[in-house]
Amino acid sequence: MYTTAGMSSVPLTMPSPTHPVAEGDPTPDALLVDRLRKGETAAGEALVRKYYQPLVRYLQRLVGNEQLAEEMHQQTWLSVLEHLDRFDARHVTGGFKAWLFRIATNKANDYWRSSGRERAAKDGLRRVTDEQLPPADFRMEGTEQEQKLKWAIEQLPDAQKQVLMLRYYSNLKFIEIAEMLGCPLNTALGRMHKAMLKLKDLMAD
């Protein structure tokens, strides 16, 4: 159960990682956020349940550690509660989901930047490729080809890897990716374009 000074009347219970929760709550995020602001605990817990699995999976692939991902998941929701009054869906492309994942990305970036964590950051990016579904153009059969694809993805600059992961693992729209990364849409598109060209060159060798 988690609260913040600004919303002490709204405790949220985090799901247990040993008890998976259902995704796809049909209630619109905007409605749940509005109810949460009014102090409805159930609305906050519905949001947590809705995004628990994709958010934890995303964090786990960023930091490469299940326990750490769970901790960052909790920290992310604490930040959501702390800054919920500042959230305005009219000014956030992609809505609450984009805002939530951007907070999570910032948590991971803070971890990467902390003292002695540079190697862990690179390891986390490599782990992203382990279960990453590649673009259709690059789906191949055979262990050797799969290993070559993983190797090729590892050669990409970190910024390009991150866009690739968000697009093909989290299945996000580019406008949402840009909002999460805090960059212009054209920048996100450009990184993806360069990543695809680089992958084609590497796979052709």
PLM features: residue spans?
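Arg/Lys-rich amphipathic alpha helix in sigma70-family domain 2
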Residues: 85-86, 102-123, 142
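Short, charged helix-capping/linker segments at alpha-helix termini
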Residues: 23, 37-46, 56-75, 185
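DNA major-groove recognition helix of helix-turn-helix
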Residues: 112, 192, 199, 203
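Intrinsic, short, N-terminal disordered tails of RNA polymerase sigma-factor systems
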Residues: 1-38, 46-50, 119-161, 165-166, ...
